[in-house]
């Protein structure tokens, strides 16, 4: 069945570029375009598209207000089209709280060398969006930033970190930012484990996601950098466009594990790749690994989960009932790799029980 798409952007050039990209895909047809949020909302109601590509910064009615009204008046999967820049990235992350399914980076120019690769990513996300479970995209604006006293306590605790006793590795794609916020904000400050995350997102957005989660979580959260130590109570998120692996080093006759980032080939169309992280931690940490495969498209993570199982680690898949898209966890279940299948709101409790 052909996917009917509506493109909403105040730039005539971007509307044309996106429309041309989407119409090249035989499974997608652009049924309309809109020049601002007000125009877009009217066309969503009139045309009833399967997916909306929505600019996050527009005149008349901005992206967030438009998104909120779409989800209230005519619930439809929405993919945010965002430029880079701290303000745009912050608005995009807020859009996930309002119910956006995914984000794509705004094309910078038709002649860009990366355009074919970007076009494939755009089409892939648009093909996935209509599969989203809109029931699990209801507005979630209930996680408040930590107060200054708690933040100071968290920062002081970071100075005392030791090598991790356990490794919690998380892979997510479509619907992941919301799922990560719910999960990570449910974990205790004194978690006796390091947390490593791969979330499929364009470059730039993972830094904003890390800052946002750090402001709301009792754990320290940061975008991973080359050479970062892997430590208890710290969440490291792979930066967009970089694979994240673990390497073991000797420092003053003591072994420690650190982060290694690389721009190796994409795996299953993704960089960072969940498979790359999972294989790496399986080889370094073996049975101390607890891996979680959350909501997301395609099957990234399944091959890596198989390696984790071989080394004695645990694999937990998110249940269909709480997923936005059941692709990645569904593949884990299909291949009989899951030790447990749990809805998102039960995962933190089970992680704490396993780690003890």
Swiss-Prot record:
The keyword Plastid does not apply. One of its GO terms (cellular component) is cytoplasm. Residues 161-356 form the CheB-type methylesterase domain. Keywords: Chemotaxis, Cytoplasm, Hydrolase, Phosphoprotein. The active site is at residues 173, 200, 300. The keyword Metal-binding does not apply. It is an enzyme of class 3 (hydrolase). Pfam families: CheB_methylest, Response_reg. One of its GO terms (molecular function) is protein-glutamate methylesterase activity. Phosphorylated by CheA. Phosphorylation of the N-terminal regulatory domain activates the methylesterase activity. GO terms for biological process: chemotaxis. Its EC number is 3.1.1.61, 3.5.1.44. Its main location: cytoplasm. The modification 4-aspartylphosphate is found at residue 55. CDD domains: CheB_Rec, REC_CheB-like. It is found in: Cytoplasm. Belongs to the CheB family. PANTHER family: PROTEIN-GLUTAMATE METHYLESTERASE/PROTEIN-GLUTAMINE GLUTAMINASE, PROTEIN-GLUTAMATE METHYLESTERASE_PROTEIN-GLUTAMINE GLUTAMINASE. Involved in chemotaxis. Part of a chemotaxis signal transduction system that modulates chemotaxis in response to various stimuli. Catalyzes the demethylation of specific methylglutamate residues introduced into the chemoreceptors (methyl-accepting chemotaxis proteins or MCP) by CheR. Also mediates the irreversible deamidation of specific glutamine residues to glutamic acid. This is Protein-glutamate methylesterase/protein-glutamine glutaminase 2. It comes from Methanosarcina acetivorans (strain ATCC 35395 / DSM 2834 / JCM 12185 / C2A). The lineage of its organism: Archaea, Methanobacteriati, Methanobacteriota, Stenosarchaea group, Methanomicrobia. The gene is cheB2.
């Amino acid at each position: 069945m052909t996917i009917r798409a509506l493109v909403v952007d105040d730039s005539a050039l971007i509307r044309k570029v996106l429309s041309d990209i989407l119409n090249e895909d035989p499974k997608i047809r652009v049924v309309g375009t809109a020049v601002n949020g007000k125009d877009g909302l009217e066309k969503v109601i009139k045309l009833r598209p399967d997916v909306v590509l929505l600019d996050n910064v527009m005149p008349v009615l901005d992206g967030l207000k438009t998104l909120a009204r779409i989800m209230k008046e005519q619930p439809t999967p929405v993919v945010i089209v965002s430029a880079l820049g701290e303000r745009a990235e912050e608005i995009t992350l807020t859009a996930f709280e309002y119910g956006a399914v995914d984000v794509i980076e705004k094309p910078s120019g038709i002649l860009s060398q990366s355009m074919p690769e970007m076009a494939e990513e755009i089409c892939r996300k648009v093909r996935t969006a209509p599969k989203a479970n809109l029931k699990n995209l209801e507005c979630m604006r209930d996680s408040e930033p930590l107060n200054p006293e708690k933040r100071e306590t968290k920062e002081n605790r970071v100075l005392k970190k030791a090598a991790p006793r356990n490794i919690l590795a998380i892979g997510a794609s479509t619907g992941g930012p919301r799922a990560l916020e719910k999960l990570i904000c449910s974990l205790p400050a004194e978690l006796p484990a390091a947390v490593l995350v791969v979330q499929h997102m364009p470059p730039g957005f993972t830094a904003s996601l890390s800052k946002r989660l750090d402001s709301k979580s009792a754990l320290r959260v940061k975008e991973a950098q080359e050479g970062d130590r892997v430590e208890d109570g710290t969440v490291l998120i792979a930066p967009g466009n970089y694979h994240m692996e673990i390497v073991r080093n000797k420092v003053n006759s003591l072994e420690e594990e650190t982060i290694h980032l690389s721009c190796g080939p994409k795996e299953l169309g993704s960089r960072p790749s969940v498979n790359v992280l999972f294989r790496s931690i399986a080889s370094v940490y073996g049975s101390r690994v607890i891996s979680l495969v959350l909501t997301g498209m395609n099957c990234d993570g399944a091959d890596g989960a198989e390696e984790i199982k071989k080394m004695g680690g645990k694999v937990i898949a998110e249940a269909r009932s709480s997923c936005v898209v059941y692709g990645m966890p569904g593949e884990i279940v299909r291949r009989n790799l899951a030790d447990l299948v749990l809805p998102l709101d039960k995962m933190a409790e089970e992680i704490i029980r396993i780690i003890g």
